[in-house]
A protein has these predicted regions:
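Conserved PDZ fold ligand-binding element
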Residues: 657, 661-685
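Blade-terminus and WD-like Trp-Asp/Gly-His loop motifs, strongest in beta-propeller folds
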Residues: 1-3, 39-47, 93-100, 136-141, ...
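A short helix->beta-strand "capping" segment at the edge of beta-propeller domains
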Residues: 171-187, 445-462
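PDZ-domain C-terminal substructure recognizer with occasional recognition of PDZ-binding tails
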Residues: 260, 688-700
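A flexible loop/linker signature enriched in serine peptidases of the S9 family
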Residues: 1-23, 27-39, 43-72, 76-92, ...
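Terminal targeting/pro-maturation regions of precursor/exported proteins
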Residues: 533-612, 639-641, 652
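Conserved blade-ending motifs and adjacent loop-strand segments that build the rim/top face
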Residues: 124-138, 351-362, 460-467, 495-504
Length: 700
């Protein structure tokens, strides 16, 4: 009863080993086993029942693969180990009481307590829970306690009858209290009004209408129990559209830019809406969903048309042509390469712009209607490996222009110089002034499909990855290594715009940049952007109601698996019933860790690996760094500490160096550490006490 056994991965980054340490402190001693997890000593301390693997904190259920655990008994005197369960199911948490070893097993599907008799070597089932797993048992003396369905049970090992324990905790539930958060720390999207005076910003599931210069910041949704996202201002400035799951499904909503109640545009949606885009005339919205559909919505009458659905994958970067008559997008082909398409809305037909032998994606029409700008991986410039006989094809991406009309010349074609002849322009007919202005502001996009794959030209840029494309027909903007760049098609010169990504307003006049939790709005830059004046986000305050927010997160997690799981039959599970089973525990959730645990248990029911829960905002203490020496150490009878083995390192590498082999240290195995920073090591029972907080700190 004077020792503590624990698991540590200090000697192996993957497999944990078991160590023992005196309860009063001192150097730890390794248990001579290759690996270890949950364990329990026999009452005489001469044998150890243990697991080899420790993965109970992962969201895996019903696993029967190579990492499924067994209970092993280690006898140090005989230097032997024995597998006492030898079962394909998960057998974990051994608890040695007298002549019996209790443990958890899901050999009958639901995790229950079983017991192994060390005399008869027989296993019998102890508990018979069928709805929730028995979790995290622990023993003291002859009593075992465990959790099931949120309740604590205790069981006497002699009677083997579990009893529910009535527990009352006096708690203020401080982590479940509502609080006000700074919304600027949670921004997920931003969209400018047509002239750039205001912007609509989504943050932590809320939609804000914010002045770019001066004015009032408005939270136009105020729905802590719903997840609003991807809000976009309509090009005519009259409305704001956004996605919300207020009904329990993701739907599109429309709100007047001046305020008022939102209008639900879509109803009875059956899957997750990915993204959407306004048409330039503000009359239609195109959106994609998890069923790989492209949907066209008439905003005025809410008429919905599915124009495309693919079994191969989703359509990405769907957007309109400037004259509202075409769509463009990319989608994978049968060889798993992405192809760029244009879609004739009136003719109801799609046409490939690129062929299937080059990965092509992120298409967007230039605002003058002349080009389709996209990225493509067709820059074959292999790098020869310095460590093996091989070539690597990376940095294959480039920016390309498809010349939509056969009458459009390549911007890189050399032209002959012409003599400029002055002429007196005819006086414009005032009656046709407005008509001419409107025609000029909305270019007609002419696409000659025949031969379009041969009318593709490349910007003279190095192979790299390119994102966030935009073009006004004269300049092409893109994000790549080093930030946002602009290529001037006339000067044929690249300029650096900013180290932040850029988004453009519907009118093509203003741009918004996001950098270091700040938003900046400028005129569309023709060179280096001036990001000296950030938008005032100080009034983006969000009242977080954790109870409602956690319920929404739970529901969205359930829908994410419903819509995104690789098999529609959910491995034969009743996914709706599973949701109800774990939703019953939501009223008892008082921390984000509670929520994560419930979601993890729910998705674990699918019996699939590597499906984990993002922890989100959880309270965690600051870790204290520990200085380590890269050596095995023992304590001498003198009280000082002896270097038994020094691990070699690479002194030229900060990550791989070994402190005691640094040039100038000259420590050797067999030598003693007699003091650390002047403190004699024989004055402490564990010299590592003197290395607390000493990681990467000069120490002598």
């Amino acid at each position: 009863g004077n020792g503590i056994v624990y698991r540590n991965r200090i000697s192996d980054g993957f497999s944990g080993k078991l160590y023992t340490v005196n309860k009063e402190g001192g150097l730890s001693e390794v248990v001579p086993l290759p690996e270890g997890g949950f364990c329990s000593y026999s009452s005489d301390g001469k044998q150890l029942a243990y697991n080899r693997v420790m993965r109970e904190f992962r969201t895996w259920k019903y696993y029967k693969g190579g990492m499924a655990d067994d209970i092993w008994v280690y006898n140090p005197e005989k230097k032997s180990v024995e597998n006492i369960t030898n079962n394909e199911a998960q057998d974990i948490f051994p608890m040695w009481i007298g002549d019996e070893i209790y443990f958890l097993s899901d050999r009958d599907y639901t995790m229950n307590l079983f017991v192994y008799n060390t005399k008869t070597k027989q296993i019998s089932k102890v508990t018979n829970f069928t709805e929730y797993d028995v979790k995290f048992p622990s023993s003291f003396g002859n009593t075992i306690v465990f959790e099931n369905g949120g309740y604590i049970y205790k069981m006497d090992a002699a009677s083997k009858k579990p009893e529910k324990v009535n527990v009352t905790l006096a708690s203020d539930n401080v982590y479940a209290r509502s609080e006000i958060k700074d919304g600027s720390k949670y921004i997920t999207s931003a969209s400018l009004s047509p002239k750039g005076e205001r912007m609509v910003v989504t943050a932590r599931g809320e939609v804000f209408n914010i002045p770019v210069d001066k004015g009032v910041t408005k939270n136009i949704t105020r729905t802590p129990g719903a997840h609003e996202r991807d809000a976009q201002w309509s090009p005519d400035g009259k409305h704001i559209a956004y996605i919300s799951d207020a009904t329990g499904e993701t739907e599109l909503y429309l709100q007047d830019s001046e305020g008022g109640e939102p209008t639900q545009l879509t109803k009875n949606n059956d899957t997750y809406i990915r993204t959407f885009q306004w048409s330039p005339d503000s009359k239609k919205i195109v959106y994609t969903d998890r069923k790989n559909r492209i949907n066209l919505l008439d905003v005025s009458n809410k008429q919905l048309t599915t124009i495309s659905q693919s079994l191969l994958g989703e359509a990405r970067n769907v957007s309109f042509s400037p004259d509202n008559n075409w769509l463009t997008y990319s989608r994978v082909s049968d060889n798993n390469f992405s192809i760029v398409y244009v879609y004739d809305i009136a003719g109801k037909k799609e046409y490939p712009v690129t062929d299937k032998w080059y990965e092509s994606y992120s298409p967007v029409f230039s605002t003058d209607g002349k080009y389709l700008v996209f990225t493509s991986a067709r820059d074959f410039n292999p790098t020869y490996s310095q460590t093996e006989w091989n070539h690597v094809y990376n940095n294959m991406g480039g920016v390309y222009l498809a010349l939509l009309s056969k009458d459009t010349a390549s911007p890189f074609m050399e032209t002959d110089a012409e003599v400029a002849i002055e002429s007196t322009p005819a006086k414009a007919d005032a009656s046709k002034k407005d008509e001419t202005k409107n025609e000029a502001s909305t270019p007609v996009v002419k696409i000659d499909i025949e031969g379009i794959t041969d009318r593709i030209v490349k910007l003279p840029l190095p192979g790299s990855n390119y994102y966030d494309l935009y073009s006004d027909g004269t300049n092409v903007y893109y994000f790549t290594k080093g930030g946002m760049k602009m290529f001037d098609l006339k000067k044929q010169k690249e300029e650096t715009v900013s180290d932040a990504a850029m988004m453009v307003d519907p009118a093509g006049k203003k741009a918004v940049f996001f950098k270091d939790d700040q938003l900046f709005v400028t005129d569309i830059p023709k060179g280096k952007a001036n990001l000296s004046k950030p938008v005032n986000l100080a009034n983006m305050k969000i009242t977080v109601d954790y109870t409602k927010e956690w319920a929404q997160i739970f529901d969205e997690a359930w829908r994410a698996f419903r819509d995104g799981f690789y098999l529609e039959n959910m491995h034969g599970k009743d996914w709706k019933a599973i949701k109800e089973k774990y939703a019953a525990l939501l009223p008892y959730v008082k921390t984000r860790l509670d929520l994560n645990y419930i979601i993890g248990e729910m998705i674990g029911e699918l019996g699939v690996g590597h499906a984990y829960v993002n922890p989100g905002e959880v309270e965690s203490p600051k870790r204290v760094s520990m200085g380590l020496l890269g050596a095995e150490v023992s304590r001498d009878k003198s009280g000082f500490f002896r270097l038994e083995k020094i691990l070699p390192g690479a002194s030229w590498s900060k990550e791989l160096r070994s402190p005691l082999t640094e040039p100038g240290v000259e420590a050797k195995a067999g030598e003693y550490i007699v003091a650390i920073d002047g403190v004699p090591t024989n004055s402490v029972n564990d010299m590592y006490k003197l290395l607390i907080g000493k990681a990467n700190v000069p120490t002598e």
